[in-house]
Structure formats: structure tokens, C-alpha cells
């Protein structure tokens, strides 16, 4: 038997705690998010300038896409961060209606039905437009 010296609820709290920096950058990403497709899809992005301002690393962005997905009425959440000039790391999460692995694989990425990602080149708006075409097809398909 292994004793960790922590009560179960204490472990959950410590595992879910974020640094002040991580909380600030998540807050900014949530504030700057945009809903589209009648609110069924949401997107947010953090550019390199913002990453540098906060002295953030990619790991500091963990959890943002999940927080976006948890918004009531959202079927698909997209979070992107700029890795290079006109290049983005894209993370997608869905609830039930969208197979984000299909979307990601079209752009050379992969993952699971509810959690997937890829790397895309182009402007932020071009990337979102390209992703949204594939997401919209799935959402419309659900309605007939």
C-alpha cells in the first residue's frame, strides 16, 4: 500500500490548480474568443506576441480548449496558438455532434473523435474559414 499523504480532494485541487500566468493567459483567450455558426462553434487564438509578453510556453495554454468547449451551446471548440509566422498549432474539442479527428486528419493532423489537432499555415482567419467548412458540413449533416 502506498501512502501519498494527501486526501483525495487535496490531490484534485492541486492537480487542477494553474499558475497566475496560466490563469491570465486563459482569461485573455476566453475574453477574445469568437462564437460563430449560430454559437455552435467557438474559436480563440494566442499569437506569438502575446506568448512573449507573458513569457509563456505551450504548456501554459493547456486547458484553454476544454474551457471553450464547456460553454453552453457550443458543439465544437477550436483553440490555436501561433508557432511561427503564419503557422498555428490547432486544438479542437467537441461534445457530440462533430468528429474533430476527421477535421484534423484532413489537414494532416489526428486524434480522437472528441479531441484532435493539427498544424495549419496561413492567416488566422484563413485557418478558421478552412476548419469551419469541414465542421459546418458535419453540423448540417446532422440535420439532414
What are the residue ranges of the model-derived segments?
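Hydrophobic helix-and-loop "lid/oligomerization" segment in the mid-to-C-terminal part
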Residues: 3, 8-106, 111-144
Amino acid at each position: 500500500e502506498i501512502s501519498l499523504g494527501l486526501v483525495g480532494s487535496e490531490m484534485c485541487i492541486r492537480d487542477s490548480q494553474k499558475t497566475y500566468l496560466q490563469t491570465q493567459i486563459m482569461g485573455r483567450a476566453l475574453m477574445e474568443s469568437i462564437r460563430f455558426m449560430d454559437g455552435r462553434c467557438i474559436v480563440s487564438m494566442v499569437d506569438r506576441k502575446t506568448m512573449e509578453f507573458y513569457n509563456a510556453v505551450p504548456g501554459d495554454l493547456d486547458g484553454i480548449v476544454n474551457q471553450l468547449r464547456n460553454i453552453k451551446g457550443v458543439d465544437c471548440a477550436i483553440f490555436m496558438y501561433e508557432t511561427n509566422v503564419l503557422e498555428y498549432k490547432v486544438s479542437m474539442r467537441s461534445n457530440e455532434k462533430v468528429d474533430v479527428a476527421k477535421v484534423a486528419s484532413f489537414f494532416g493532423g489526428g486524434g480522437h473523435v472528441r479531441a484532435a489537432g493539427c498544424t495549419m499555415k496561413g492567416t488566422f482567419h484563413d485557418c478558421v474559414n478552412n476548419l469551419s467548412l469541414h465542421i459546418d458540413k458535419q453540423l448540417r449533416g446532422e440535420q439532414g
